[in-house]
Amino acid sequence: RHEEYARLLKGHTTADQIVIIFSGCMASLIYKNVWGDDDTCPVFVESTIPPFSTRRVEPGKVRMFVRHLAPIAFFPASAADKYYDRIIADIYEFPGKFEDVLECGLSLVNPTVHPGPCLVNLSNIEKPDFTFFLYEHGFQPSGLKIDVLLNKERLRIGEAFGYKIHALEDFAGVDTIDSWEPMYAMGHGCHALTSIAGPNDINYRYLTEDIPIA
């Protein structure tokens, strides 16, 4: 999808424009590969999460559950010094910046939140007579233990690149995560999360995107 959109966008930008990609997952590298050395290549900015958690309620109506604030990364990384303050003033109050898009990509929180609870609840997700709520029904010890292991692997990868990743820890509001309890407490203690229904289909992004990325 990123490559398809980048090809549509190429030819309609200038070098002093900024393209912001929410939930970028290192999409800047894909965009740059499409532009190559073209002198119309804009500056790319990535965030780890979308600005809002939303769900479509009905045609033409969307419910917003929570507003997100997360740091951003620039590509090239050197553009941060020039453009960060401008983005804060003109667009959105992003609370800080990553060193580069690799650190940003490794800090995506969903790949260490959704996989475990989804994998151990596939039968409930597929039940036609049951509305599954991930943060209410899925945030149980068995699934969260998988997330803890995924996060430990992610932390080791980050350390190998010289990064101190703390995305899941920030999500849970703790300094370290050594067990499932902090995530359980955070999920069940946040109405903005427990009120989000789904997934109720195995072809949902929690499974088709977050699990492969993890």
Regions found by a protein language model. Give the residues of each.
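Small-residue-rich helix-loop
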Residues: 143, 150-199, 203
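Conserved aromatic-histidine-acidic binding/catalytic patches
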Residues: 19, 23, 138-146, 206-210
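Active-site-lining helix/loop region of Rossmann-like oxidoreductase modules
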Residues: 70-170
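Internal, well-ordered alpha/beta segment that forms a basic, Gly-enriched binding/recognition surface
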Residues: 36-40, 46-95
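Active-site substrate-recognition segment that forms the wall
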Residues: 51-60, 113-124, 188-191
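Rossmann-like NAD(P)(H) cofactor-binding subdomain of soluble oxidoreductases
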Residues: 2-57
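A hydrophobic C-terminal alpha-helical subdomain
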Residues: 121-135, 190-213
